[in-house]
Amino acid sequence: MADGIDRTAEERMEFTTSKEVTVAPTFEDMHLKENLLRGIYAYGYESPSAVQSRAIVQICKGRDTIAQAQSGTGKTATFSISILQVIDTVLRETQALVLSPTRELATQIQSVVMALGDYMNVQCHACIGGTNVGEDIRKLDHGQHVVSGTPGRVADMIRRRHLRTRHIKMLVLDEADELLNRGFREQIYDVYRYLPPATQVVVVSATLPYDVLDMTTKFMTDPVRILVKRDELTLEGLKQYFIAVEKEEWKFDTLCDLYDTLTITQAVIFCNTRRKVDWLTDKMREANFTVSSMHGEMPQKERDSIMQDFRQGNSRVLISTDVWARGIDVQQVSLVINYDLPSNRENYIHRIGRSGRFGRKGVAINFVTSEDVRILRDIELYYSTQIDEMPMNGTLFYLRYRPMSRLSLWLTQSNSCRPSHVTTLSWSTNVEHTFPLLLMNAFSKIQIGI
């Protein structure tokens, strides 16, 4: 697994794919530029993942493409390699535009493009909000082969005529379900109308609801489809648990007990609102726990600094809103805690996908109040999975506020209350194992913690 992709999971993955799509088993079979191949191998890839082996050739042919695959299967590299194959680095003009829903993701994509194109003298700029407009203008006027950005700032630079669009041949929508949501939809259309009529469109995401797929017909022509079935989206190697917490105010003490008990490499804790992130961060620090936090209202410099510390391992626990749920890779994250269950079921898989990246083992723990039972059941039905109650042992793992009475009993009823087609994706469902023992077995004695 030197290239960071779980090949066992890849082999089991089934694609609902257009009939004309063929599989390229190696990068050499894709007839890529020699300097691009050098960059791919230097980046650590040895052979293409399932989505890469199907999508790269089609994108390089100029076909509009819809690619949906699990988190951590190399989607970013899929379109980055394709972009680097089709651009002309002699021409100092923007030829590919990548739009992302968050600034951090846009910056990460820029890093991937630069790394893969290390031997090609490629220029790629991250055009994102919250940064110095003058720097954007200077970089864009100088000429960039690829621009990775957020819709608002990109649209602004196009309107100001600093981002020249006449040579753009490819538009990539990363995390397309979020971009085509109401919050970004008009901005995407605003950008699209400035592009040349023949611009190729590539749509990429881990989740693509039917209404989003239907919407793509407005700006895509006869697209090639590479789609993973929805019930195969739950991540391989990622164990999902719930903890029944009858009252909202008991969540904090439960979290403190988890923090005291587990040993992890790095963890992300998700809350649904910025106010909750700030409140929980303050409470954890008051209790002498070392945590960092991030949400969309923070200045971009502060967000960049927090991200850098977290990537470098200087910060171990990050509390965040869904701004961190989309596509961001920190390979040492092994635990995700949903302090609040996401109100949008598509966001669930994006959140838990921050753990167990690139085929590593990971754990997702969901705090569930009586008001969240419907949401939990909806997630199980939607992804055809079963989320088990977290095993515990009084001597090894003790919650001071063990609220497992009626709610826990209801949640752990017989499987007759669950859909018959649900399958359990787990390493072990034997509840007599203690949770620390499960982690030890699952991670082969790799510490996962604080």
Swiss-Prot record:
Extent of motif Q motif: 25-53
Motif stretch (DEAD box): 174-177
Top-rank lineage group of the source organism: Eukaryota
UniProt-listed Enzyme Commission number(s): 3.6.4.13
Cellular compartment(s): Nucleus, Nucleolus
Entry-linked InterPro entries: DEAD/DEAH_box_helicase_dom, Helicase_ATP-bd, Helicase_C-like, P-loop_NTPase, RNA-helicase_DEAD-box_CS, RNA_helicase_DEAD_Q_motif
UniProt entry tagged with the keyword Plastid: no
GO biological process, one term: rRNA processing
EC supergroup of this enzyme: hydrolase
GO cellular component, one term: nucleolus
UniProt catalytic activity: ATP + H2O = ADP + phosphate + H(+)
A family per Pfam: DEAD
Residues the record lists as binding ATP: 69-76
CDD domains recorded: DEADc_EIF4AIII_DDX48, SF2_C_DEAD
Molecular function terms, GO-annotated: ATP binding; ATP hydrolysis activity; RNA binding; RNA helicase activity
Domain Helicase C-terminal, chain residue ranges per copy: 237-398
Spans through the membrane: none
Family annotation (PROSITE patterns): DEAD_ATP_HELICASE, HELICASE_ATP_BIND_1, HELICASE_CTER, Q_MOTIF
Free-text domain note: The Q motif is unique to and characteristic of the DEAD box family of RNA helicases and controls ATP binding and hydrolysis.
UniProt xrefs under PANTHER family: ATP-DEPENDENT RNA HELICASE DBP3
Similarity comment: family membership: Belongs to the DEAD box helicase family. DDX48/FAL1 subfamily.
Protein purpose: ATP-dependent RNA helicase involved in 40S ribosomal subunit biogenesis. Required for the processing and cleavage of 35S pre-rRNA at sites A0, A1, and A2, leading to mature 18S rRNA.
Name the record gives this protein: ATP-dependent RNA helicase FAL1
Organism encoding this protein: Ajellomyces capsulatus (strain NAm1 / WU24)
